[in-house]
């Protein structure tokens, strides 16, 4: 029942609309709204010659006509708004346009010689890149953004108190140091550097001497026999070479060995019975010490050089 009502209702509404349209056509033969004819002068959507709104005619269209006397959208000679003619006061690019004209006397957007705002001429006080610009000029006496010698703010010269990368005369960056100390440091800077070099060389010589003595003692201990006697009374001196990567602090390598005197831990000789017992109890589960063979190198630290 509901579906039947839904199908009948649109049909009834369409019949009512058709009957009303036929009644209107029978009553008025001249349609003033939907007709696109030429004779009716009171039409609205008609594109004829005398249409007062959307017509593109020659003389009588007051709004959208592009003729000679259109006061709004006409591009003629006397259009006061959107005309690009000689006397347009707003959007005209002529000689006397006071706003958007790019002529000789435009006070705002003109790129002439006497433009006070956006002109790139000689006397522009703001955005001019001339000789006397007080703000954005890159000349000789610019107090703000100039990269000259006497700029007090952003200058990279000799006496800049803020952002200067000078020698050491800046009173702001080196706070807490008086001028006398600064001047003396600057005078004797080379002498201080020489004394520092001498101290570093003396420290290096002491390190070299200590390393040489350590190497001699180690070689003598390795050359001794099992009874504590030195073979033939000779000690083999091994030259010690020191470079910048062999310091005292963090090094890799063999020159930083630590002599371990614990013979039970590192220099023990194992008998056959000890080895057989180890093999019987442990087998291949744990790494066994070398039998009848001493390690070539002793314990070493891993230091960065």
From Swiss-Prot:
One of its GO terms (cellular component) is extracellular region. Transmembrane segments: none annotated. InterPro entries: FMRFamid-related_peptide-like, FMRFamide-related_np. Keywords: Amidation, Neuropeptide, Repeat, Secreted, Signal. Residues 168-305 form a propeptide. The modification Phenylalanine amide is found at residues 36, 47, 66, 84, 93, 111, 120, 129, 138, 147, 156, 165. Residues 1-19 form the signal peptide. Central nervous system. It is found in: Secreted. GO terms for biological process: neuropeptide signaling pathway. The modification Isoleucine amide is found at residues 75, 102. PANTHER family: FMRFAMIDE-RELATED PEPTIDES. Belongs to the FARP (FMRFamide related peptide) family. Can function as both cardioregulatory hormones and transmitters and may regulate cardiovascular function. This is FMRFamide-related peptides type HF-4. It comes from Cornu aspersum.
């Amino acid at each position: 029942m509901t579906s039947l009502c839904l199908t009948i209702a649109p049909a009834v509404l369409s019949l009512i609309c058709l009957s009303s349209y036929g009644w209107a056509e029978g009553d008025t033969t001249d349609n003033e709204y939907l007709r696109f004819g030429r004779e009716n002068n009171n039409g609205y959507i008609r594109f004829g010659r005398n249409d007062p709104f959307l017509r593109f005619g020659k003389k009588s269209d007051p709004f959208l006509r592009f003729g000679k006397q259109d006061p709004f959208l006409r591009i003629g000679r006397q259009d006061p708004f959107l005309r690009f003619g000689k006397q347009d006061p707003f959007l005209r690019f002529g000689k006397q346009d006071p706003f958007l004209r790019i002529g000789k006397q435009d006070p705002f957007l003109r790129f002439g010689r006497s433009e006070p705002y956006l002109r790139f001429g000689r006397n522009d006080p703001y955005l001019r890149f001339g000789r006397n610009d007080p703000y954005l000029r890159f000349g000789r006496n610019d107090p703000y953004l100039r990269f000259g010698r006497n700029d007090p703010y952003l200058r990279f010269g000799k006496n800049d108190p803020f952002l200067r990368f000078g020698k050491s005369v800046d009173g702001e960056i080196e706070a807490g140091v008086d001028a006398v100390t600064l001047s003396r440091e600057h005078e004797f800077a080379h002498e201080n550097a020489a004394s520092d070099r001498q101290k570093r060389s003396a420290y290096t010589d002491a390190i070299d001497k200590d390393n040489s003595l350590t190497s001699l003692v180690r070689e003598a201990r390795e050359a001794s026999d099992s009874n504590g006697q030195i073979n033939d009374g000779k000690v083999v001196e091994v030259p010690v070479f020191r470079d910048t990567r062999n310091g005292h602090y963090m090094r890799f390598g063999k020159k930083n060995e630590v002599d371990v005197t614990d013979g039970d831990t590192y220099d023990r000789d194992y008998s056959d019975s000890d080895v057989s017992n180890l093999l019987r109890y442990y087998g291949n589960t744990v790494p066994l010490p070398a039998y009848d063979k001493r390690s070539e190198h002793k314990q070493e630290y891993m230091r960065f050089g």
